[in-house]
UniProtKB/Swiss-Prot annotation:
Residues 18-45 bind DNA. It comes from Penicillium terrestre. The lineage of its organism: Eukaryota, Fungi, Dikarya, Ascomycota, Pezizomycotina. Transcription factor that regulates the expression of the gene cluster that mediates the biosynthesis of macrophorins, isoprenoid epoxycyclohexenones containing cyclized drimane moieties. GO terms for cellular component: nucleus. Keywords: DNA-binding, Metal-binding, Nucleus, Transcription, Transcription regulation, Zinc. The keyword DNA-binding applies. Pfam families: Fungal_trans (PF04082), Zn_clus (PF00172). PROSITE patterns: ZN2_CY6_FUNGAL_1, ZN2_CY6_FUNGAL_2. This is Transcription factor macR. CDD domains: fungal_TF_MHR, GAL4. PANTHER family: UNCHARACTERIZED TRANSCRIPTIONAL REGULATORY PROTEIN, ZN(II)2CYS6 TRANSCRIPTION FACTOR (EUROFUNG). GO terms for biological process: DNA-templated transcription.
């Protein structure tokens, strides 16, 4: 038998097909950037660059070391949003063929092997970012290979089609999968079988056959990493992140600051060593971290006051251009990772943070759709069922609580703006615990990536005190709205229980206010000038979340917590207001009680934009319906009860709020991010005024036209008012009430002869408070005939108790006189015309509210 010829050894071919076609074992057309098969199948087409090893003849993926130069890709890359950054030596993608010189110092956690490091790192290309570790040497460096998440990276899908019986069933099944995906599967789902819960995942995701070392098919990894070219430079990003922590996070603490800071530092550390290291496990496991990064920078740029843009790192940048490009990059990142189909906590938090800056204010139907979608997304992630979170860390559970209650708060705001029932049912209000007051810390932040000390100390947080007050108020408001909008008439027992719960809530809010450090009494309009005139660019320490000393943020927090109390009372009392009728004394009393609440609310609200120090927080209140509701009720009161008495303070508050709202739309706002055609009118590109504000403006003009020249109040003479501050005509009603008491005051009786121009004191940070001692007593019954209102007399008694309780919420200056030590005499109080000493303690305080009793 002849000997066979020697077998010829052939070199393996280089595969030029895309990964999807090779996995499906079909012929690939090799079209760039996407092959025809992937386009037809709607798959994300990904090509893996291969190279032949000359020494072994084997084919392996291309490593960064195999590249001759990264500069060759610069010609093919798209234009940068900031062209001048491309010409800067510190830019993420400099146009120069060589990199900047290395730095002499190397951070403690940086890899020692790279020979070159740059002062401001560049963002690596997509090919470098998705390289598999198969070609790497065992000693090759990897920046912080251990994940910095508060839990281990999501496990890969089980390779077993049928899970073993050892997988114990759970009533609420929470599936934690790759890519940060978390899905809640309820027992009513048609594909749910007890003990086989993991099978339910396959009905929702198409990633069963995805390679565990490759990016998830639903995420356009190439687009995500190419999008990093839109990042600002490291110094610019640092400044925007700092602004985010100053102006955004304290108001919506939906992130864990130490984890965010660690992820941010780790990301830029990888950029600095991208030629020799892979991205962190966290970024590779969940690329949606890029969405969160863009969202944080976008929020920081949008909320930054004008003074912030004078920062050295931001010089030469225009806010409008920077915000626009960051907004585009952020929205693109959400699209590339298919947020609504495959949500993660990163994308959900990003959506919540950017909502106030992306959405136009006072668009109820848009808000309705956005909020309802957000609620459903949160429910698919199991945020409404805390019982299923046992596999998560304590930090993850705390953040999920914050996110859920913030969504409940948004749902309540949307419900009030549309008059519809909330999307979150009452059962969801008891299934998630309330957030804690202290910072919570992760256990596995790398040693070299620790955030600033003020972010890592276990301590009480003023931001969390406000969050707790807001979330607890939202929980009760959701119950009240659901009860009032029920198909059945409100019952006395049910409504009485809500009133009792409201009283308990206000006691809790008072306890929260007492825990906030204070100087002066900000919620009553007395703010020290060093706080009222502060600026974050010159006095950043006054804006820190510091519970040990008075700060600008603590003053803002006390004001906002006080407004929550008034909002609760207005929500309870407003549905039972009778039709306005000046001839009906009971209607007059009921409307006067409500008008007092509204004017008191507006007087406090005016401080939020009249004090310059609060400018970083102005974005938070720009879309709230509370001020508009109070303006509307006050306008109705002024229109139908014109001859009921002096109403100068009410007119002043309404005029100021209307003027402030209209001023926002009088001229194009260079810092506005809402630049779509629907957001502007045809008159010179001005921002289109929302319909709600336009209606209030029309009512305000109609009120002026209905008054005769003799009835219109002349302009306020603030200088003379300030000189006669102690003789303000605001004491008129208090003097009338005290005349019926055993000890009438002779001082306040003289105020009836005060000049008309001095009926309102200066109110730059809010008019001084309503007098306390003898406040107007609400009527014993709001309605004359119970049959006319459809309510029985017992229920009317409950409403009467509600009015009496609501009247007690009006801030009282007599309480201030009883506590002169609360005022700091060596600090000034801001007024419209400047600082005014409060050393006299009792001098210059009003005695009453200018409303008929």
């Amino acid at each position: 038998m002849p000997l066979s010829e020697p077998r010829q050894i052939k070199k393996p071919r280089l595969s030029l097909s895309c990964i999807v076609c090779r996995r499906r074992k079909v012929r690939c057309g090799r079209e760039q950037p996407e092959c025809a098969n992937c386009v037809r199948m709607k798959e994300n087409c990904v090509y893996r660059t291969m190279v032949r090893d000359e020494s072994t003849g084997r084919v392996r993926p291309v490593s960064p070391q195999d590249k001759d130069s990264r500069v060759s890709t610069s010609d093919a890359r798209p234009d940068l949003p900031w062209p001048h950054w491309g010409r800067d030596t510190n830019a993420p993608y400099p146009d120069k063929p060589s990199r900047p010189p290395s730095r002499p110092q190397v951070s403690a956690n940086a890899s020692p092997s790279p020979q070159r490091q740059e002062p401001y790192p560049t963002v690596p290309s997509w090919e470098e970012a998705i390289q598999l570790p198969s070609y790497r040497d065992a000693n090759a460096p990897q920046i912080n290979g251990s994940s910095t998440t508060t839990r281990d990276p999501s496990p890969a899908p089980s390779t077993s089609l049928f899970p073993t019986p050892s997988d114990h069933p759970c009533r609420d099944y929470l599936s934690i999968r790759r890519g940060g995906r978390v899905r809640y599967v309820g027992q009513t789902f048609w594909g749910f079988v007890a003990g086989k819960e993991s099978l339910s995942d396959d009905f929702f995701d198409e990633n069963r056959h995805a390679h565990p070392d490759l990016p998830l098919p639903h995420i356009s990894s190439m687009g995500m990493f190419n999008l990093l070219r839109s990042l600002p430079t490291k110094p610019v990003s640092d400044t925007l992140l700092e602004t985010f922590f100053l102006a955004v996070w304290p108001l919506v603490p939906l992130l864990h600051p130490p984890s965010l800071q660690a992820d941010y530092d780790e990301f830029w550390e990888w950029c600095r060593n991208s030629e020799n290291a892979l991205p962190s496990d966290k970024l590779r496991d969940d690329p949606t971290l890029i969405c969160l990064l863009f969202a944080v920078l976008y929020c920081g740029a949008s909320a930054a006051p004008a003074a912030t843009w004078a920062n050295t790192n931001l010089q030469g940048l225009q806010k409008e251009t920077t915000v626009s490009h960051l907004k585009s990059a952020y929205t693109t990142s959400l699209s590339l990772c298919q947020h609504q189909e495959h949500p993660t906590l990163n994308t959900l938090v990003s959506n919540l943070l950017t909502g106030p800056f992306l959405d136009r204010p006072f668009e109820p139907m848009r808000s309705l759709v956005n909020v309802s979608t957000t609620v459903r997304i949160a429910q698919t992630m199991g945020l409404h069922r805390e019982g299923a979170w046992s596999a998560l860390s304590s930090v993850d559970r705390e953040i999920r609580r914050r996110v859920w209650w913030h969504i409940v708060w948004l749902d309540v705001q949307s419900s009030i703006s549309t008059g519809l029932t909330p999307c979150c049912g009452n059962e969801a209000l008891d299934a998630v615990g309330m957030v804690g007051t202290d910072h919570v810390e992760p256990s596995n932040i790398p040693a070299g990536l620790s955030p600033p000390n003020e972010l890592v100390t276990n301590r009480q947080s003023v931001a969390m005190l406000y969050a707790i007050g807001r979330f607890q108020t939202a929980r009760l408001q959701a119950r009240i709205v659901a009860h009032l909008q029920s198909a059945h008439d409100p019952s006395q027992d049910g409504f009485g229980e809500l009133i009792t719960d409201s009283k308990e809530l206000l006691q809790k809010i008072d306890s929260l206010i007492a825990r906030v450090p204070t100087q002066g009494i900000p919620e009553m309009g007395y703010i020290p000038s060093r706080l009222a005139n502060a600026s974050p660019s010159t006095q950043p320490l006054l804006y820190k979340d510091d519970p040990s000393q008075p700060t600008v943020f603590s003053a803002w927090t006390r004001i906002m917590l006080t407004l929550l109390k008034s909002e609760m009372a207005i929500l309870l009392q407003k549905p039972f207001l009778p039709p306005p009728d000046s001839a009906n004394p009971q209607s007059l009393k009921s409307w006067t009680s409500m008008a007092q609440l509204c004017v008191n609310y507006l007087r406090i609200y005016l401080q939020l934009y009249q004090a310059p120090a609060f400018s970083p927080y102005a974005w938070f209140c720009c879309s709230h319906y509370g001020p508009l509701q109070c303006v509307f009720i006050t306008l109705m009161y002024l229109h139908y009860f014109q001859h009921s008495g002096e109403t100068t303070l009410a007119r002043y508050c309404v005029d100021e709020v209307i003027h402030h709202c209209v001023a926002q739309y009088q001229a194009p706002d260079p810092s506005s991010t809402r630049t779509s055609p629907d957001d502007t009118d045809s008159n010179g590109g001005k921002l289109r005024m929302p319909l709600a504000i336009q209606v209030l403006v029309d009512l305000h003009e109609r009120l002026d036209s209905s008054l005769g020249p003799e009835d219109r109040a002349p302009p306020l003479d603030l200088i003379e008012c300030q000189a006669r501050f102690s003789m303000s005509h605001l004491a008129t009603k208090a003097s009338d009430l005290r005349a019926t008491s055993d000890q009438p005051s002779s001082d306040v009786s003289s105020t009836t002869r005060t000049h008309h121009n001095c009926e309102t004191p200066p109110i730059t940070t809010g008019a001084p408070p309503v007098a306390a001692g003898n406040k107007p007593v609400p009527p014993n019954s709001v309605f004359v005939a119970g049959s006319d209102s459809g309510l029985d007399m017992d229920f009317l008694a409950t409403i009467s108790d509600l009015e009496a309780w609501s009247s007690s919420l009006i801030l009282e200056s007599d309480n201030l006189l009883a506590r002169p030590d609360d005022m700091t005499p060596d600090h000034a109080v801001i007024t419209r015309l400047g600082s005014q000493s409060t050393a006299s303690g009792r001098r210059g305080l009003p005695d009453g509210l200018d409303f008929p009793g």
